[in-house]
Structure formats: structure tokens, C-alpha cells
Amino acid sequence: MSKGRVLVAMSGGVDSSAAAALLVEQGYEVIGATMQVWDYSTCDIEEGNGTCCSSIDVDDARAVADRLGIPFYVINCEAKFRAAVIDPFLKAYLEGQTPLPCVNCNTYLKFDHLVKKMRELECDYIATGHYAKIVYDDKGKASIHTSTDDWKDQTYFLFTIDPELVPKLLFPVGDMKKPQVREYSESRGLVTARKKDSQGICFVGNQGYQNFIKDHVKSEILASKKGLIKRFPEGQVMASHEGIHNYTYGQSKGLGMDYHEKLFVIKIDASDNTVWVGEEKHLFANEVDVVDPKLLDEIQDGEIMNVKIRYQHKGAPAQVIKTASGFKLKFTEPQRAVTPGQAAVFYRDRQLVGGGWITL
């Protein structure tokens, strides 16, 4: 007897392939679906080499579905992806921020577009290859927790999920480590078993985000983002630059200037296109403002939580204080290179509680 019908989001990578295979083994009625999100022929990227949902990835996902004997759908999401992921990505850099496109992709495509497909196909669950876990408490309430593989854990990108969707989520590889996922996939004869992981931003690839921006933003707009590099905090003009989109907080290489000491980007002021550089000590901050929060569970005003300010950040204890626009975070220890456009994500032990967007 089937445990229920589940739609698996298959990116064409090993993790989602393994997720589909595990669910078949566990007795679910599995349906695979891949989102075609981007025309990689418009970019200087080799398809299938660290990409996600390209035509080659779609073919790989279909091959896995055929191997498993499950139905498979391709959903064209290019227009939605452009509007919800690419355009905000470009806009953020032009405003002096460092965007986090994976969260937008999860919010507006994986857990929106695919959820609609899940309901259309009358599925009971939706599954992905994310490294995360669903845990039920003694009252039967479901919550998202970090995965067994701390290094690969992807809960940082999941804080915008609708809480009502959580009981319908399955993360089959959440109890496994990456080498186990590859070994399992190989044992099942899946073509993706030794496929490279996607690295960095999937639609940018190895060309670098500056080149991607240059290819997708009009030259006159880029020219309007030129400005000065000034010393922080004194204000001494040190050089000119070719655009604030070429810089991010904490950057120390490729500043476009020579100086006798190592300097870092401390602040980017989009109002006058000034890039402020200074000593590393100026990168540290005790307090951070977070806007547009999304919560999966309640937070007590002033509660101490473990907060991650970027992916692969180990997290640090901070007091979470409610404000009119979101939260103010007061860290126990100063944090380095707190970056506007990135997310601050809250954890209670291993439970994902919510998060919001960093602003300075």
C-alpha cells in the first residue's frame, strides 16, 4: 500500500535524484518534476557544469525518472524565474547590496510554482533534495531542523517557507552525508551519481557575477553607478571606481587601487555611489537590523537565538528584539562583514525558526 503520492523537485543533480529513489524504495507513489528556469545559451556557461535546471540537467532528471519508472514533468518557469530571481539579483547589486537568489528561487518557484503542480496532481507531499529534516514533536507538530551533514545543511535558504506547508514537506537525504548520497545513487545506477555539485550562483556559473551583470544591464545604467572610493571613516578620496556593483562588504581584492596596507570594503553608499574602504576592525558590528521577517515558529521578544548571517556561517548567539519593521539583533560577540541583501536566519538549537533580510 502506498504511503502517499509525492511530487519530487528534480534539479538534475545527485541529491534530488537520490531523494526520488529513496522515496520509491520507501513505498511512496513518486512523480518527478523539473523546472526549466533559464536559457544558459545566453551566458558564457558550460551547461551541466555546476548549473541547475539547464537543458542537460532536465535530460539527466528525465533519465533518473526513467530508471526509477516514475512519471516525469518539465515545467517552464523562465518568465517567473526572470521576474522573481534574476531581476531582483541585478537590482540588489545596483543598489550596493549582495543578493541571495537561492532564497527567492525557493520562495517563488520551488515552494510556490511546484506546490501548485503538487496540488494539480493531487499529491500529498512535495519533496526536494535539500539537506534538512522534518521533525515532529510529541503533539504532532512538524518543524524544519538542520540536517545530519552540518557542512551541507541548507536550512539557511528555507526560512521563507509557508508554515502550513511544512507538514507536507519531505527531505529524504536529510539524514545522510554527501558521500553516502553519492554511494547510494551509484548503487541504484543513477546517471547523476558522480555529477558535479552546483557551485555558487547556478545561473552565473564560472563567468563571475560582474560579467553576468555586464551582459544583462544596459551600459548607460552601469555607467551611472561609477563613483569614488573613500577611506573610512575619515572620508579621504583614494580612487575612483567603475561601479558599486563590482563590490561587496568585506572584499579586499580587486578594489581597483594600490595602497601600502590591506584595506576592506566597509560600506557601500548607493545614494552617491561611494565605496568606503578601511581597516578590518571596522568590519565588525554588534547590532544588525532585519526587515521583512518570515517566521516558522513564534519568537519571544528578547529571546536569545543562534543566528546565521550568511550561508556557511556557524551562527552566533544574539538577542532578537522586535521592532516596527522586523527585528534588531544584538550579538554577544561582534560579527564580521554583516552584509545588506543577505539573510539573518534564526535557530532554536537545531530548529529553523525564521529569518529576515539584513539592512544597515
UniProtKB/Swiss-Prot annotation:
It is an enzyme of class 2 (transferase). It catalyses: S-sulfanyl-L-cysteinyl-[protein] + uridine(34) in tRNA + AH2 + ATP = 2-thiouridine(34) in tRNA + L-cysteinyl-[protein] + A + AMP + diphosphate + H(+). ATP binds at A9, M10, S11, G12, G13, V14, D15, S16, M35, G129. The active site is at C105, C202. Keywords: ATP-binding, Cytoplasm, Disulfide bond, Nucleotide-binding, RNA-binding, Transferase, tRNA processing, tRNA-binding. The keyword Magnesium does not apply. Disulfide bonds join C105-C202. Its EC number is 2.8.1.13. Residues 152-154, 310-311 are annotated as: Interaction with tRNA. One of its GO terms (molecular function) is ATP binding. Pfam families: tRNA_Me_trans (PF03054), tRNA_Me_trans_C (PF20258), tRNA_Me_trans_M (PF20259). GO terms for biological process: tRNA wobble position uridine thiolation. Its main location: cytoplasm. It is found in: Cytoplasm. GO terms for cellular component: cytoplasm. It comes from the Bacteria. The record marks H130, Q342 as: Interaction with tRNA. Belongs to the MnmA/TRMU family. Catalyzes the 2-thiolation of uridine at the wobble position (U34) of tRNA, leading to the formation of s(2)U34. This is tRNA-specific 2-thiouridylase MnmA. It comes from Bdellovibrio bacteriovorus (strain ATCC 15356 / DSM 50701 / NCIMB 9529 / HD100).
